[in-house]
């Protein structure tokens, strides 16, 4: 109870004086109609602006904001442009030249190397081709870590696409190669000697091959249709295939819009053995879903009502299980004061397909012995308020109640000296997945402020209360707070900083040895932590920019996962070069 009061007090302190919360980035607060009158030749530069400073985001560094990844696709400008009205003559600043391509290289302590290359080329007025290469690696060197804590992550993506008046499409081919080490030995609980440590083979390699496509028909009932095939495997005999396709169709009748979404999602794979060395673990899940809905937009009110119907067929070690799920799909919003203040609410559910690849993306230190099963997200009921307090201040506040069956939790694997499995992940230095039913009460607030065209500030906070059926909500924090600041100091110099706080989390540890009178079973509380990062950059000219990036400035050797301390104070010095062919 005292800890909960402290969390609520912390949130109140951060938001006091700010007097408002921020608008969520992915929420729209209004629409406009434009008339398209003439085509033009698309360029990649019209679609986005190159980042001057790369982001180092890795399990052995720091915990960053959650990012959702989609099928790799290069942004390309539309082949149409809206008509431009003639404005009164005003003094204008010269626009910064935009480039289609860039290369970035950064080098830092811990033997860190960060490299990126992005290129694109228009083949005609409509067709384009592009490619991206990314590399992030570190030689490690975290204090008091007994095993190798180096890592590398290299990815290559190629895309080809076309945009016309009638149809947009693109196809993507990607490959990723990652290497990590299970370096988190439970030395606090187990007295490892040098011979035992030297006998551990702690490295793990992941490889991913993806083939994706996206189709968008401009006219007719068919909407955007994404599809993806992913082949994922590791160096310990694990392999997994994933395929999904999600077409959608809609049509309008007067003020009503009827929409139907279809989902076909398959995942199947196998592990060479389980945690105790028993060979051959296999699984497959095939989910089919249809989500019909009707949308009504009238004056300041928007209501979308529908339902999701899903069928799931699972086969685990030759045992078959068939299930049917029904979910609410209801969303509504009302403009209380035009686009300045909007109230919204909803009740949504979904069948979430879990996979080995997704678990590895979230936690690189899982063992290749996981139980894979989908999560039944029964409902997420929410209500919120968003909008603007002024032209420079936007806010969003939201409360929700969510119920999930078979929610996946990461928890530390046990260490048993009598385990016949001797792979490098069985020494209490890896993580498994357990499933439990979870109910979550969540309060979220966000504030975005542009003090001027050169200064932008944002702050957000989330408080969660968890209720489970069987055990703890393992490795889920009750409190998360983050803030960021970006400043254009001069035309040449820019800088930024961000800080985030993550509250306590709980995990469990089990150790058994013939020398013990009884096994050691312990619930461990991972301490809360904060992380402060900053960067500064200098634009030498329109093409060349130098940057300095500082991570974990306070040198907090916190544990993101049990027994896995992160790297301390990190420095990355580099440059970004933009160019056209």
Model-derived segments and their meaning:
Residues 117, 156-158, 211-215, 243-247, ...:
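Membrane-embedded beta-strands of outer-membrane beta-barrel proteins
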Residues 138-151, 155, 172-224, 228-242:
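Flexible loop and strand-edge segments within Gram-negative outer membrane beta-barrel domains
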Residues 22-93:
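N-terminal periplasmic/intermembrane-space "pro-region" immediately following the signal or transit peptide
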Residues 203-212, 228-300, 432:
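Outer-membrane beta-barrel transmembrane domain signature of Gram-negative proteins
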Residues 121-143, 261, 283-315, 450-465, ...:
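Surface-exposed extracellular loop regions of Gram-negative outer-membrane beta-barrel proteins
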Residues 98, 103-106, 302-581:
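Exposed, low-structure sequence patches enriched in small/polar residues
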Residues 83-85, 94-103, 107-144, 148-154:
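Outer-membrane beta-barrel translocator/receptor signature
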């Amino acid at each position: 109870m005292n800890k909960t009061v402290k969390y609520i007090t912390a949130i109140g302190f951060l938001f006091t004086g700010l007097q408002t919360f921020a608008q969520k980035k992915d929420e729209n607060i209004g629409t406009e109609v434009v008339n398209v009158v003439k085509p033009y030749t698309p360029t990649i530069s019209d679609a986005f602006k190159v980042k001057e400073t790369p982001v180092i985001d890795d399990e052995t560094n720091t915990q960053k904001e959650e990012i959702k990844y989609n099928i790799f696709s290069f942004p390309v400008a539309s082949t149409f442009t809206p008509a431009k009205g003639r404005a009164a003559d005003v003094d204008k600043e010269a626009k910064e030249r935009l480039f289609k391509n860039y290369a970035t290289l950064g080098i830092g302590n811990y033997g860190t190397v960060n490299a990126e290359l992005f290129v694109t080329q228009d083949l005609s007025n409509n067709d384009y081709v592009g490619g991206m290469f990314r590399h992030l690696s570190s030689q490690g060197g975290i204090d008091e870590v007994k095993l190798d804590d180096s890592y590398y992550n290299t990815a290559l993506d190629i895309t080809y696409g076309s945009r016309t008046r009638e149809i947009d499409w693109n196809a993507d081919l990607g490959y990723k190669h990652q290497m990590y080490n299970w370096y988190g030995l439970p030395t606090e609980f187990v007295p490892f000697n040098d011979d035992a440590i030297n006998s551990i083979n702690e490295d793990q390699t992941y490889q991913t091959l993806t083939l994706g496509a996206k189709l968008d028909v401009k006219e007719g009932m068919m909407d955007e249709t994404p599809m993806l095939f992913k082949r994922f495997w590791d160096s310990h005999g694990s392999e997994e295939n994933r395929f999904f396709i999600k077409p959608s169709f809609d049509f309008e009748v007067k003020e009503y819009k009827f929409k139907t979404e279809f989902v076909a999602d398959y995942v199947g794979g196998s592990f060479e053995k389980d945690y105790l060395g028993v060979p051959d673990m296999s699984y497959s899940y095939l989910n089919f879903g249809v989500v019909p809905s009707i949308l009504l937009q009238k004056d300041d009110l928007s209501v979308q009502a529908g339902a999701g119907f899903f069928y799931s067929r699972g086969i685990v070690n030759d045992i078959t299980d068939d299930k049917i799920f029904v979910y609410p799909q209801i969303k509504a919003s009302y403009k209380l004061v035009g686009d300045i203040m909007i109230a919204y609410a909803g009740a949504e559910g979904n069948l979430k397909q879990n996979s080995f690849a997704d678990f590895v993306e979230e936690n690189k230190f899982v063992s290749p012995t996981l139980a894979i099963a989908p999560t039944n997200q029964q409902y997420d009921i929410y209500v919120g308020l968003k909008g603007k307090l002024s032209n420079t201040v936007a806010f969003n506040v939201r409360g929700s109640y969510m119920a999930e069956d078979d929610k996946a939790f990461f928890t530390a694997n046990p260490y048993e000296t009598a385990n016949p499995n001797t792979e490098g992940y069985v020494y209490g230095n890896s993580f498994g997945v357990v499933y439990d039913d979870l109910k979550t009460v969540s309060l979220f607030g966000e504030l975005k402020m542009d003090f001027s065209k050169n200064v932008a500030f944002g702050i957000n906070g989330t408080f969660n209360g968890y209720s489970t059926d069987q055990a703890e909500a393992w490795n889920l924090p009750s409190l998360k707070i983050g803030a960021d600041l970006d400043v254009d100091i001069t035309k040449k110099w820019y800088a930024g900083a961000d800080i985030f706080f993550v509250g306590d989390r709980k995990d469990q540890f089990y150790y058994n040895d013939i020398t013990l009178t009884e096994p050691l079973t312990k619930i461990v509380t991972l301490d809360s932590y904060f992380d402060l990062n900053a960067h500064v950059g200098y634009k030498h000219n329109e093409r060349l920019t130098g940057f300095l990036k500082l991570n974990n400035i306070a040198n907090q050797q916190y544990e993101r996962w049990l027994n896995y301390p992160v790297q301390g104070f990190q420095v990355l010095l580099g440059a970004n070069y933009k160019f056209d062919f």
